[in-house]
């Protein structure tokens, strides 16, 4: 597991109040991890803070799974 993947999974677990072991790549925030719309907004904000990026609303709407979040962070993070 890459450093970015581990950081993303930790943030998701903390934001959604689930065990890190439940946060696997294929999981959907809403369907599998019980997130609501406010949770997803807070999750995007936490990812922005962690990786020093700004996620436009149109991109945020596409980040619906753990893997989407990992891929976005890998592509856009500032080293």
UniProtKB/Swiss-Prot annotation:
Residue intervals of the Carrier domain: 2-77
Source taxonomy: Bacteria, Pseudomonadati, Pseudomonadota, Betaproteobacteria, Burkholderiales
GO molecular function: acyl binding; acyl carrier activity; phosphopantetheine binding
SUPFAM superfamilies assigned: ACP-like
Function (record text): Carrier of the growing fatty acid chain in fatty acid biosynthesis.
Designated name of the protein: Acyl carrier protein
PTM comment, free text: 4'-phosphopantetheine is transferred from CoA to a specific serine of apo-ACP by AcpS. This modification is essential for activity because fatty acids are bound in thioester linkage to the sulfhydryl of the prosthetic group.
UniProt-listed PROSITE patterns: CARRIER (PS50075), PHOSPHOPANTETHEINE (PS00012)
Cited InterPro entries: ACP, ACP-like_sf, PKS_PP-bd, PP-bd_ACP, Ppantetheine_attach_site
Cellular component, GO annotation: cytosol; membrane
Annotated pathway: Lipid metabolism; fatty acid biosynthesis
Modified residues (O-(pantetheine 4'-phosphoryl)serine): 37
Naturally occurring in which organism (per UniProt): Polaromonas naphthalenivorans (strain CJ2)
GO biological process annotation, one example: lipid A biosynthetic process
Family designation: Belongs to the acyl carrier protein (ACP) family.
